[in-house]
């Protein structure tokens, strides 16, 4: 899985 957050 690839997850991006700020």
Swiss-Prot record:
Record key words, sorted: Hydrolase, Secreted, Serine esterase, Virulence
Induction details: By contact with cutin.
EC number: 3.1.1.74
Cellular-component GO terms for this entry: extracellular region
Catalysed transformations (reactions): cutin + H2O = cutin monomers
Superkingdom of origin: Eukaryota
Chief place where the protein resides: secreted
Activity regulation info: Inhibited by diisopropyl fluorophosphate (DFP).
Gene Ontology terms, MF aspect: cutinase activity
Compartment list: Secreted
Note, other: On the 2D-gel the determined MW is: 40.5 kDa.
Role of this protein: Catalyzes the hydrolysis of complex carboxylic polyesters found in the cell wall of plants. Degrades cutin, a macromolecule that forms the structure of the plant cuticle. Allows pathogenic fungi to penetrate through the cuticular barrier into the host plant during the initial stage of fungal infection.
Family: Belongs to the cutinase family.
Protein name: Cutinase 2
Species per Swiss-Prot/TrEMBL record: Colletotrichum kahawae (Coffee berry disease fungus)
Phylogenetic placement of the source organism: Eukaryota, Fungi, Dikarya, Ascomycota, Pezizomycotina
């Amino acid at each position: 899985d690839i997850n991006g957050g700020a």
